[in-house]
């Protein structure tokens, strides 16, 4: 009878005190996310301004995302307020919970303290993970919900607890209500299930009950989509054609290595080998196949968004931690443990400045040029990486619009609306508008188009982000009155001419539908 390595002798009913190392790493993750907020040179991220607008208008769906994240943000705004710290606290906590679950998965796989700690540390310092837990969006919750699914699947496989499929269905349903692309994870898991001995669970009533629960949870969003002409499908189609960069399979793989910390690549690759080839991980082959199906889908789609697979890495880090720990136990234990964990940590430190707002913008420009992070969107250029550039210039934009508004004759006051090209501009003007006495804002972009259709017609519009040619197609009188400039924002948000538009050629109800744009921040 084979003996188990010391790395696998872990009592699964161990008290919380035995997982102190995981609590400490989770706390470390929270500190990584929140302490950089002391750097006041970076403000709200573009999407945060939009999500706060969505949270003010709760619905069962939005053009570019499902409803869960705005619902949760509404609770945050009610209880904690809308400061940068308040709205980023929950993403940081979701990230910490994901780190804790990563180590817990390693524990369920049979890993000891080092295996669990290595897995959790690798996840905590991964650049992509740091980026997407650093501002409010769907991404931190996607990672948490899917990692929770993986944890439950490991328990189902190892402990033969089929009733847990109902909880998997609950988390999948919530995941789909948070981000539609979780369907790719669910389908990959389902296909892997059919190709492994775990397929016997398909005959379990608990499996189908979980599936029914997932469908029931996401049903309100499906109804909203039908009522709104499948708006999200139009958004995804346009984003795929005009936003994402065509990427070769090799570039897709290299981007995965980059965003998950190049020095942690041996850990997650070891995790893949653990699930696919090792005797200890054979029972959990479903997880290795799930990752391969996800990666194949990314390569086939030529996706330039490496974050689309971010939620797949906790399970690989967990498996890698167990495999590496078993290898280390048979050799110079303490030395190898220090070298391996140290390498992962060094990689995290090296890439942290392009993931967290710790450097002043001027220094960050130079650092980013040295590391050259992958480009993820067409036409999206700036001196800073996009996830930092889109945290600058928004309040200055509101101030620029306020200056233009002061040029209007008194007789036009009260009959003015703002017209912004994209949801970032519209969200910024709506959020900072009261501070500068600005009127309501319209935008033809994504869900703002639906909201704006309910507005009354104005006599005068102050427009930003749209071209003079496009505006003259709608208004007879288009006058440039100012320019908005920002130093570190995205190029397409810099040097924007501000126009005052009057005398619409047709009534609002006729020209507004033609301006609709579902897709990325720019049409081209």
Description of each model-found segment:
Residues 26-29, 119-127, 172, 176, ...:
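Short helix- or helix-capping micro-motifs
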Residues 89-110, 148, 152:
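Transmembrane-helix motifs of polytopic, lipid-linked glycan transferases
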Residues 183-284, 302, 353-357:
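Transmembrane-lumen/periplasm boundary regions of multi-pass, lipid-linked membrane glycan transferases
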Residues 57, 164-179, 214-215, 293-299:
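Membrane-interface alpha helices of multi-pass inner-membrane proteins
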